[in-house]
Amino acid sequence: MLPEVIENKQLIGVKQMQAASHVLMVLPRASKIDALEKIPYLEILRSALKRRRMQPDELAKSPITTDLAQGGVASWLMLDDGASRFEQYSVLRKGIALLTAEQPREIVLAVFGDSKQRTLAAELAVYVALINSAVLPSRKQKTKIENVKKIVLYGDQSRHGHAVARAVAEGNTLARELTMLPPNELTPTHYRAQVKKLARANDWKNEEFDFKRLKKMGAGAFVAVARGSHEQDAAIVHLSYSPKGAKQRIALVGKGICFDTGGHNLKSAKYMQGMHEDMNGSAVALGILLAATRLKLNIGIDAWLAIAQNHIGPLAYKQNEVITALNGATIEVVHTDAEGRMVLADTLNLAARAKPDLMMDFATLTGSMAVALGSRYSGIFSNRETLLTQAIAAGTRSGERVNSFPLDADYEPALDSKIADIKQCTMDGEADHILAARFLMRFIEQRPWLHMDLSASSCEGGLGAVASNVTGFGVAWGVEMLRNLKL
């Protein structure tokens, strides 16, 4: 559970700071300390900057801490109005991290500047404090981690109680919690049980297409991957959020590979490490659905989660097989470690049959996207130029940055097969992120579609607003897309 937020319109004073144990001081950017007014303990900050040989405006990138007279600690930073949302979130994350390292039960946020500056600073600081206050999964016996119970804000009072910040933070936290669970605690069986609990708690309609049902339906692409698991507990899970009066329906599709060995084309130990996080796309879809539900968005949402594992064994699919997908297309298997596009093919086609106004899928799909972008951006593809424009704008506003890639038809011949309708991938791997998107496009029935290849699902040291290595990237972006969607 995220902490409560208590708001005070008045600026923080010396008395409140003396009573606080952990304070985040968010100042407007200024080149000189003398330009700042009505800020308690400013002389302490001045001395700390002098000791570090820092200029005041360096606080816009590198926060510092000072001890307070009554035993508390203050983290000082400056927020630049002209910086990007990503840059603003990044400095706030660094400032909050200096406080959360001590596991405080309460954090005080103090914002300064004119009314416009304080409102922006409060909005961003509350979000960053919320998103970094939850205790994430850990199984250390001797280390008890306390989560933040209360956030107290001085300097601004919102009209809506920071509802958007709380909803997005809750959705992001859910995505990270699921992604970080060890693979013995999040098998497809466990995952499906957790999803059922979420569905009951949030009044979502829940339908499961289990292994036997999918096999009977002819979902050969999904079944090919799922059949390698002895338990045969894989499923496509369909969740529905249906507010009254909603005129649009959106499909969220997520890759949920709970562990990826690579199959017969077995990964090495180096590249198998961390493959319990290969279900991150489905967790992001769930996080967006949860946030949209909390915000009561007037959009119908169907989430389709492709939950399976990619195991090696006598029944596992192998190279050179020809598989028939749900839409009847035949697929030549080239590499068993390209399982994500296989499970997504049938899941996308199942989602497309409901004729949604927009389909958005999320997947940790290709290594080539990580090579192209690193772990600070995620890549997007679309069959509609207008959606790409909206997607990039949503990334700028949310602080979850995305970069678009081409889907030109002249990439298609690389997937030509002599024995099937399409190759799963190529052996040389050139432009695999683009070829994977071209492959998926075969299964969307020409519906408006956005595909996100989640190269930023994990970033060492955190990313933007989020301090953990697992970022939950895509939840804030997805909510921003839905809140401002134009179709």
Q: Model segments located where?
A:
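Short amphipathic alpha-helical segment within the helicase RecA-like ATPase core
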Residues: 1-256
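A generic structural signal for tightly packed, nonpolar segments enriched in small/aliphatic residues
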Residues: 2, 59, 192-487
